[in-house]
Structures are given as structure tokens and as C-alpha cells.
Swiss-Prot record:
This enzyme's EC code(s): 4.2.1.11
Protein name in the entry: Enolase
Principal location class: cytoplasm
Domain of life the protein comes from: Bacteria
Species assigned in the record: Paraburkholderia xenovorans (strain LB400)
Gene behind this protein: eno
């Protein structure tokens, strides 16, 4: 039995210099699992609650000592002696201990740190790499990365309203070659920006954050970078957007301040459709406000056959909300953020529900990250097919890419890279 004999929670810092939660779980055999949780900047209103201290004189109120204390007291007492290999039972124990719908009592950050650390300890105990522990012998598909090479919105201090402009390498035979493609486009873009006298400073997720005059100008420049790096836009590399539309939806209008536009749901749908006609855009995330389900339906009806429409703030990795979206024909993909829901069991349930409905599942980081690379193992372990984990800079982003390289190496000849077939929702 892989009995849990010790649990240690601690406060560490994330990639933005804000506190987050880390947890160590020690088993009877002496094996240990360690996990750290991420934190978002643009968050959905229905996400599980991240417990912060609210003490203004310490880390601006963002400390997590309360969450850490919950790990070291209540949670420790509840799961001490449990079998670490019984993940579903352990997560159920955490949910019952918290007793709220949104994990507001113990904090999703406390619960997730424990859930992840237990899984890592159990994998170590079993002598399995984490991806194999999650997925068994069927885990062999590397994910197609969506690489955020230009940051805007809440992730950068510039005039771009759309939060993320991403490149998606799809023609390469392996993940290693896809990663090389992304890195080469990233460096080509840096040279173009530098030659124009534009900023090459990076945002929270490692992408550049220059002041483009419009979203159109930004996308055109990315196409130039793809060509400069020796690749073909629309063939070797596709584009993806994260609008994070909830961030610029005010008074019933989508207010693109950078372009001086105020658009209705129908008008913003047309705006996005025009971009998708002009550029090789394969995926649009959060193209409408999380509560604008009528707008989402309009967007899905217009673009859902040719563009992946990803619900992030819309679904918040929650099976109850996802089920409603599937029934109503809203979006065709879900973004999976482990800290939006707070346990691995619930995360995996959301991925499986999406797949059964023909929706894709995109495994995602948060803008506030750590060196923890668990999401890379989740992406492969559950054969998710897609991952979104930032740009080609900042070690908090690169740690996930490097872990995927290791996994591909470990898989050897049975490793596969899906390319365009990862977008099975567009068939």
C-alpha cells in the first residue's frame, strides 16, 4: 500500500512574483511527490476559488498562508494514511472536506497542490513516468502546441485588445520539429520587431508585447515572421487567437479600445469571421463574454465548422457547464486549466466529457506559472492532442516544452505527433 505518511504545504512565488502554493507528499516507502499550482490574470467568474490571505501589508493581500495552513492541518489529518494510488477516492475526500460548490473554504489552490503531489508520489512509487501513470499504455500522442508569441490584453501593457496571438505548427513529423519551428518563427519575429524599432520586451507568457496599431497589423507581421523563418503560413504553421472577450465586454458591447470600436455580439462575430477569412486562423478562444451565450451561439453557428472555438472563461473546466454547452451547441472545444476546477479527477472528467461529445480539449497553463510541468504529462497521458503553454521564452513556459521533449524521447518509435488531425472537431 502506498500510504501517505507526511504532507507539507508551503508558500512559494510564481512567475509574476506573486505567492502560490506548493505541496510535498511523502509515502511510506520514502517516495515523494511535489507540486506547485499556477494562477491566472484573466479569470472566469465561475472558476473554483483561489484562496488568498487578503492581508494588505503582506504581498499586497496576495499571500497564501491560509491555504498552506489548510494543507498542513485539516487536509493532512483527512488524508494521512490513505493510499496514494487511489486518486479518485483521495480527491473525493478533499471535495467532501471542503464542502462548498466552488472550493472557497479550503481553497482550490490548496486542494490542487495536494491532488497533484499525491499523483506524482504514486507515479514515483509505481516506477512510472507521470504521463504513463495517468494514461497507461495508450499514452503515446504528443500535443500540438499553440505558442503565444504576441501578448496583449491583460497579459501585456500595450494597445492590443486581443490577449494572445499564437502560432500552431502542424506539418512537422515530430513534436521536436514542431518546437524548433515555433522557436525559429519566434526569433524571426523578434528580428522584424527590432528592425522596425518596436519593443521586444515580453509579457507574462513570454510573447512579445509591442504596440501594433491593430489586430490585423499584428497578424500580418506574424505571417511575415513565418515566411522569414522559412515556413508556409496556412500549410506548415496556422494561427490561433485568445480574445479573452470577457475582459473588454462592457455595457453590452465588445469595446476594442485599441481600434476605437464598440461592437454588438453579431458585429464582433463578423469581425472575427473577417479575420478568419483573411488569415489562416484555426482556433479562437473566448470569442465572446462568458455570459453571452446568445453571442456564443451566433459565433458557433457562423464559424464552428471551420474554426476551433474554445471555451475557457465560458466552461472553466467544469463538467456541469460543459454539459450545458454541449447540449446547446455552444463552442466546439474546451480549455483545460487544472486550477479552474481544483482536482485532477475533475480535470480528467472534463477532458473525457469533451472527447465523447466530439469537442477537443486544449490543456493550458496560466499566466502566473511555476517550473511545475505536470500539464505536459496530462496532455500526453490523456492523449489530449493540443497544449497551450506560452511562448518560446521564460523558463516557466519552456519547462513544459522541455518535458514534452523528454516524453517524446521516452516514447521512442511509438510517439506520434497529430498535426492538423488534432483539430478533429473541424471535420
Amino acid at each position: 500500500m502506498s500510504a501517505i505518511v507526511d504532507i507539507i504545504g508551503r508558500e512559494i512565488l510564481d512567475s509574476r512574483g506573486n505567492p502560490t502554493v506548493e505541496c510535498d507528499v511523502l509515502l511510506e516507502s520514502g517516495t515523494m511527490g511535489r507540486a506547485a499550482v499556477p494562477s491566472g490574470a484573466s479569470t472566469g467568474s465561475r472558476e473554483a476559488i483561489e484562496l488568498r490571505d487578503g492581508e494588505a501589508g503582506r504581498y499586497g493581500g496576495k499571500g497564501v498562508l491560509k491555504a498552506v495552513e489548510h494543507i498542513n492541518t485539516e487536509i493532512s489529518e483527512a488524508i494521512m494514511g490513505l493510499d496514494a494510488s487511489e486518486q479518485a477516492f483521495l480527491d473525493k475526500t478533499l471535495l467532501e472536506l471542503d464542502g462548498t460548490d466552488n472550493k472557497s473554504r479550503l481553497g482550490a489552490n490548496a486542494m490542487l497542490a495536494v491532488s497533484m503531489a499525491v499523483a506524482k508520489a504514486a507515479a514515483e512509487e509505481a516506477g512510472l513516468p507521470l504521463y504513463r501513470y495517468f494514461g497507461g499504455s495508450g499514452a503515446m500522442q504528443l500535443p500540438v502546441p499553440m505558442m503565444n508569441i504576441v501578448n496583449g490584453g491583460a497579459h501585456a501593457n500595450n494597445s492590443l485588445d486581443i490577449q494572445e496571438f499564437m502560432i500552431v505548427p502542424v506539418s512537422q513529423p515530430t513534436f521536436r520539429e514542431a518546437l524548433r519551428c515555433g522557436a525559429e518563427v519566434f526569433h524571426a519575429l523578434k528580428k522584424i520587431l527590432s528592425d522596425r524599432g518596436m519593443s521586444t520586451a515580453v509579457g507574462d507568457e513570454g510573447g512579445f508585447a509591442p504596440n501594433f496599431g491593430s489586430n490585423d497589423e499584428c497578424l500580418s507581421t506574424i505571417l511575415q515572421a513565418i515566411e522569414k523563418a522559412g515556413y508556409r503560413a496556412g500549410e506548415d504553421v496556422l494561427l490561433a487567437l485568445d480574445c479573452a472577450a470577457s475582459e473588454f465586454y462592457h455595457d453590452g458591447k465588445y469595446q476594442l479600445a485599441g481600434e476605437g470600436l464598440q461592437l454588438s455580439s453579431t458585429e464582433f462575430t463578423d469581425y472575427l469571421a473577417n479575420l478568419a477569412d483573411k488569415f489562416p486562423i484555426v482556433s479562437i478562444e473566448d470569442g465572446m463574454h462568458e455570459s453571452d451565450w446568445a453571442g456564443w451561439k451566433t459565433l458557433t453557428d457562423k464559424l464552428g465548422k471551420k474554426v476551433q472555438l474554445v471555451g475557457d472563461d465560458l466552461f472553466v473546466t467544469n463538467t456541469r457547464i460543459l454539459k450545458e454547452g454541449i447540449e446547446k451547441g455552444i463552442a466546439n472545444s474546451i480549455l483545460i486549466k487544472i486550477n479552474q476546477i481544483g482536482t485532477l479527477t475533475e480535470t480528467f472528467a472534463a477532458i473525457e466529457m469533451a472527447k465523447r461529445a466530439g469537442y477537443t480539449a486544449v490543456i493550458s497553463h496560466r499566466s502566473g506559472e511555476t517550473e511545475d510541468s505536470t500539464i505536459a504529462d496530462i496532455a500526453v497521458g490523456l492523449n489530449a492532442g493540443q497544449i497551450k503553454t506560452g511562448s518560446l521564452s521564460r523558463s516557466d513556459r519552456i519547462s513544459k516544452y522541455n518535458q514534452l521533449l523528454r516524453i517524446e524521447e521516452d516514447l521512442g518509435d511509438i510517439a506520434s505527433y497529430p498535426g492538423k488531425s488534432a483539430f478533429y472537431n473541424l471535420r
